[in-house]
A protein has these predicted regions:
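A conserved mid-protein helix/loop that constitutes part of the nucleotide-sugar donor-binding site
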Residues: 18-22, 199, 208-222, 244-245
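A charged, aromatic-enriched C-terminal amphipathic alpha-helix characteristic of glycosyltransferases
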Residues: 63-66, 342-387
Length: 387
């Protein structure tokens, strides 16, 4: 039995890549051979440093992703697209029994329609280099059609009811909610009982314009004026093309004269992230409309009180008193979070157990078994593994 995992690149090391890694582990542990189709060769050391686990032994083959390919690779029993929010990957023989699409949020068709420059560049990296404008337009149309067919002709999984409603509205497809995997046990065990916390504020996000990190810098200006918090640490991974956006954020900090309040750390190691989590009392998420919010769950499991915008999937698990719509409300929510008792932190931490990697793997394996029948005997014979 062979399963083909499809993902643009695992080297971005964000929440979507964590899900792809857990999915690879879930399928491999069932005794099914796993092949990876991707545009960029995985940097196994970077992946290990980011997630504390290796997938090298789980992959039987790594092939170059070809979104023009019309049919599945020979002998492939099931295709799992773990990048279904961005990647229009469709084969003519796809159906709901041999194709699974994990769609964090159905954004690709919108990005194609509006001609988003970043997404257009991503499509060009896939197949458009050297094409004439007329051929590029034909390919954009083909990509749009492929995305729609992929969503309609596969079993679609998503991360929250917020995303489920968006998928139903856009494609008429009723997807199944499978929350993404989060290393809640690692963060809880390493950080929950920390006695070294101060009034510092933590932000975890990939440095990319789509993440709207400038929102937390605008909030930081008001927090500093109101003498709330000792510092704000903004940390996350950054690819080479993120330098321009990072410079913009740096200039914004200087414009607000927040150099002594806002600090950036890029591509930090996992142990450094744990150090910051042990010190922080409040986590702020910058993006309204976040489909789920893996970093929010990580922070909660570590005993950090989350403060999030009041639109998005994170509203399904963050208490209303820690949600905000305006920056003024954000200041009030941060003040409430800073004053939260230890019992509140423990309660929120333990509420995240349902999002554990173990639960994700178990539920994904059950879905795979139910729709394909390829793993029943293997699943019964092998225990659920942990990353």
């Amino acid at each position: 039995m062979i399963a083909n995992i499809v993902h643009i690149s695992l080297n971005a090391r964000g929440g979507g890549e964590r899900l792809a890694v857990a999915t690879i582990k879930a399928i491999s542990s069932m005794g099914i051979d796993v092949e990876l189709s991707t545009l960029e060769k995985p940097d196994m050391q970077l992946i290990h440093d980011a997630y504390g686990t290796s997938i090298e032994a789980d992959l039987k083959k790594i092939r170059t992703l070809n979104i023009f390919q019309k049919y599945r690779p020979r002998n492939c029993n099931v295709t799992v697209n773990t990048h279904g929010d961005m990647l229009p990957f469709y084969h003519n023989d796809f159906n709901k029994k041999n194709a699974i699409t994990y769609c964090h949020y159905p954004i690709a068709s919108h990005l194609i329609d509006c001609g988003d420059p970043d997404y257009s560049a991503a499509l060009q990296n896939m197949c458009l280099l050297g094409m004439t404008p007329s051929l590029q337009n034909r390919y954009y149309n083909a990509a749009r059609t492929a995305y729609i067919k992929m969503m309609v002709n596969s079993t679609v999984l998503t991360n929250s009811n917020f995303s489920r409603k968006a998928i139903l509205k856009s494609f008429g497809v009723d997807s199944a909610v499978l929350p993404p995997p989060v290393d809640v046990d690692i963060f809880r065990n390493a950080c929950l009982t920390s006695n070294s916390r101060d009034d510092s504020i933590l932000v975890i996000s990939r440095f990319h314009p789509s993440k709207k990190i400038e929102n937390v810098i605008h909030l930081a200006k008001l927090l500093h004026q109101n003498e709330l918090g000792t510092e704000m640490n903004i940390v996350g991974n950054m690819l080479p093309d993120g330098v321009g956006y990072f410079n913009y954020l740096n200039n914004l900090v200087k414009h607000y004269e927040l150099e002594n309040f806002v600090r950036f750390e890029i591509n930090l190691r996992f142990d450094r992230l744990l150090d910051l989590m042990r010190r922080s009392k409040v986590y702020v998420h910058p993006l309204p409309g976040e489909p789920f919010g893996i970093s929010t769950v990580e922070a909660m499991s570590a005993g950090i009180i989350p403060v999030v915008p009041d639109i998005g999937g994170h509203t399904e698990f963050v208490p209303a008193k820690y949600q905000f719509h305006t920056y003024g409300q954000g200041v009030e929510a941060v003040a409430t979070a800073l004053a939260a008792p230890a019992s509140e932190k423990a309660k929120l931490s333990h509420s995240t157990q349902k999002y554990s990697v173990t639960n994700y793997i178990k539920k994904f394996q059950q879905i795979l078994t139910d729709i394909t029948d390829i793993g029943k005997k293997r699943m019964e014979a092998k225990p659920v593994i942990r990353l």
